[in-house]
Amino acid sequence: MKFRAKIVDGACLNHFTRISNMIAKLAKTCTLRISPDKLNFILCDKLANGGVSMWCELEQENFFNEFQMEGVSAENNEIYLELTSENLSRALKTAQNARALKIKLTNKHFPCLTVSVELLSMSSSSRIVTHDIPIKVIPRKLWKDLQEPVVPDPDVSIYLPVLKTMKSVVEKMKNISNHLVIEANLDGELNLKIETELVCVTTHFKDLGNPPLASESTHEDRNVEHMAEVHIDIRKLLQFLAGQQVNPTKALCNIVNNKMVHFDLLHEDVSLQYFIPALS
């Protein structure tokens, strides 16, 4: 089992650092899946038990100048590692304006992901800063629990408003209630609602648009104004919104009525799926 990779392009390095910061905000620990052409950051808490799930995917060729890996075997050419997200994020913070970044799987009395950052000093000579991030290698028999989540057909799929705006609305609502209802329809309308014994607050977003597939065949006989809704823990939604550092190129919200909400974001060449289950 081997893995080594190198980034020398400054824009790629900054983008990779931003992704790492986002993951650290979304998950305390995560699984890093390394395959020949992709990297995935995975969080697979069981939705049925009220946990959130995350699947973040990036094509390695869009980031790395060098990328070599050998999986656990020829037929299972993948590596699954568990790590503390904050440790990776902290290591990459030192990589701003770096000349190069190297990541390597090592064993220093315990398995590590070793991050080496080549920095230019004032005298133009370079110095290397190294971080050893402790990891756990996940055995093959547990991989089946770490596959891409199956997305059920949504009742409504809708484009999200500007995430910054949505975040500031949800932050205010969190001061009133821990629970939130997200509802949306096929007419481009999305509402965020909280209800307590004393107060009921709703924020309306209109003309957001629905992706083409959502309006065709399966929904032809549906009333486009009919709302699908899901009742969720507001803190889980806020954690997701707080993790978004940049407004994505595409942001979709898929609602499975009274079961779950699935957010599907595309940041340039990085996709992020995030699942929040309904409160039982």
From Swiss-Prot:
List the InterPro entries. Answer: Cell_cycle_HUS1 (IPR016580), DNA_clamp_sf (IPR046938), Hus1/Mec3 (IPR007150)
Where does it reside?
Nucleus; Cytoplasm, Cytosol
GO BP: cellular response to ionizing radiation; DNA damage checkpoint signaling; DNA damage response; DNA repair; double-strand break repair via homologous recombination; embryo development ending in birth or egg hatching; meiotic DNA integrity checkpoint signaling; mitotic DNA replication checkpoint signaling
Q: Name one Pfam family in it.
A: Hus1
Going by the UniProt record, its keywords in alphabetical order are:
Cytoplasm, DNA damage, Nucleus
Q: What is its main location?
A: nucleus
- Which tissues show it? Ubiquitous.
Q: Which GO terms describe its cellular component?
A: checkpoint clamp complex; cytosol; nucleolus; nucleoplasm; nucleus; site of double-strand break
Report the superkingdom from the record. Answer: Eukaryota
Assembly mode? Component of the toroidal 9-1-1 (RAD9-RAD1-HUS1) complex, composed of RAD9A, RAD1 and HUS1. The 9-1-1 complex associates with LIG1, POLB, FEN1, RAD17, HDAC1, RPA1 and RPA2. The 9-1-1 complex associates with the RAD17-RFC complex. HUS1 interacts with POLB, HDAC1, FEN1, PCNA and RAD9B. HUS1 does not interact with RAD17. Interacts with DNAJC7.
Q: What does this protein do?
A: Component of the 9-1-1 cell-cycle checkpoint response complex that plays a major role in DNA repair. The 9-1-1 complex is recruited to DNA lesion upon damage by the RAD17-replication factor C (RFC) clamp loader complex. Acts then as a sliding clamp platform on DNA for several proteins involved in long-patch base excision repair (LP-BER).
Q: Which family does it belong to?
A: Belongs to the HUS1 family.
Matching PANTHER family: CHECKPOINT PROTEIN HUS1 (PTHR12900:SF4), MITOTIC AND DNA DAMAGE CHECKPOINT PROTEIN HUS1 (PTHR12900)
Protein name, UniProt field: Checkpoint protein HUS1
- Provide the species name: Homo sapiens (Human)
